[in-house]
């Protein structure tokens, strides 16, 4: 079952490379936003 999931994700990234790139950027943005929020909370 795990092998099928891994192969499926590999096929998805092969067909939609820009999609994985986009999701990675979104995750980076979310991480940056969380850091900024934490910094603001620490400043108070």
UniProtKB/Swiss-Prot annotation:
Keywords: Activator, Transcription, Transcription regulation. It comes from Escherichia phage HK022 (Bacteriophage HK022). This is Regulatory protein CIII. It holds the Pfam family cIII. Presence of the CIII protein in the cell results in the stabilization of the CII transcriptional activator (a very unstable protein), CII activates CI, the gene for repressor, and thus promotes the establishment of lysogeny. The gene is CIII. InterPro entries: CIII_regul, Phage_lambda_CIII. The lineage of its organism: Viruses, Duplodnaviria, Heunggongvirae, Uroviricota, Caudoviricetes. It comes from the Viruses. The keyword Transcription regulation applies. Belongs to the lambda phage CIII protein family.
């Amino acid at each position: 079952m795990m092998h099928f999931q891994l192969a499926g994700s590999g096929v998805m990234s092969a067909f939609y490379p820009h999609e994985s790139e986009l999701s990675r950027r979104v995750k980076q943005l979310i991480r940056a936003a969380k850091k900024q929020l934490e910094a603001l909370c620490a400043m108070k």
